[in-house]
């Protein structure tokens, strides 16, 4: 019998926590089914000329079966995901992990089924996002004035950065990586794992641990494709995705300290904000938070405090 071919696409390097979790997912399925399935991880579609933004469409049209992708890409269909785009709302990472695997994850799973062709298999921890730049240490919003910053494909993020004083330029990660060395961007913001694994630290001396936003990635497949698999394969996909998600959350929890230990102090200056300095960024972005908070069900914020 011909094996069930399963392909998972991502946009990062092999050492990234996302691709390590994706590999774990494939290992679990292969261990259970052996030759009954074939599993292929296309860990970085950027290397085959595709932007990360193509991943969801690749799942929808059947080029691949699974992918992980920033939840920013799904917020227009699932407005509840905007909760994760708001500045400084995530304070307790463990509480958020519990929400991802609990009530909030269940809510997003339902909303994605209702509004998209996708099935949510897990919400992955993309980490606290921090500023890096090549110009000067950033300690206050005044230090951000006039700096061109690459942002994700999110107008809400752009609003936050404008509130800080940046000039945001939204581009896909593929274009960002290709241009980071060109000097187009003075600054960028990413979780430390991306800053390091994408090599940004080689071009940006200054790393400010701002934690201004928290990122999440949706691990998805196409609902129609999922329903085409035999019941035992569907069950194994669910259980393997759950285990891979738990593993991914664990990796994310310890990754920041590991990345900081790898940075060379002679090449990178890590700026730890004082409480007062952080408060200045919170104050600057408060109007953005207040404006968008009105658009969301107040009950959503309870997930961040559970």
Name the predicted role of every residue range:
Residues 99-115:
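Hinge/lid segment of periplasmic solute-binding proteins
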Residues 1-95, 113-114, 118-306:
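N-terminal secretory/targeting leader peptides
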């Amino acid at each position: 019998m011909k094996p069930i071919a399963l392909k998972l696409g991502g946009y990062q390097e092999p050492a990234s926590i996302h691709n390590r979790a994706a590999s774990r997912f494939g290992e679990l399925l292969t261990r259970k089914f052996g030759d009954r399935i074939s599993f292929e991880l296309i860990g970085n579609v950027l290397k085959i000329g595709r932007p990360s933004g193509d991943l969801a469409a690749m799942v929808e049209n059947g080029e691949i079966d699974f992918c992980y992708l920033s939840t920013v890409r799904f917020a227009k269909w699932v407005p509840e995901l905007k909760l994760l785009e708001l500045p400084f709302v995530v304070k307790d990472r463990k509480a958020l992990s519990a929400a991802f695997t609990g009530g909030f994850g269940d809510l997003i799973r339902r909303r994605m089924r209702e509004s998209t062709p996708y099935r949510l298999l897990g919400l992955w921890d993309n980490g606290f996002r921090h500023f890096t730049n090549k110009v000067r240490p950033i300690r206050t919003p005044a230090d951000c004035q006039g700096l061109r910053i690459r942002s994700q494909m999110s107008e809400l993020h752009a609003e936050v950065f404008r509130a800080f004083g940046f000039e945001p330029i939204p581009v896909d990660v593929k274009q960002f990586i290709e241009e980071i060395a060109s000097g187009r961007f003075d600054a960028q913001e990413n979780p430390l794992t991306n800053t390091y694994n994408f090599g940004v630290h080689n071009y940006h001396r200054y790393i400010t641990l701002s934690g201004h936003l928290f990122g999440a990635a949706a691990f998805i497949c196409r609902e129609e494709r999922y329903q085409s698999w035999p019941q035992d394969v569907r069950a194994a996909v669910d259980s393997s995705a759950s285990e891979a998600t738990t593993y991914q959350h664990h990796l994310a929890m310890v990754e920041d300290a590991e990345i900081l230990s790898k940075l060379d102090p002679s090449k990178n200056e890590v700026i730890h904000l004082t409480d007062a300095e952080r408060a200045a960024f919170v104050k600057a972005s408060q109007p953005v938070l207040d404006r968008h908070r009105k658009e969301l069900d107040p009950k959503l914020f309870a997930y961040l405090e559970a």
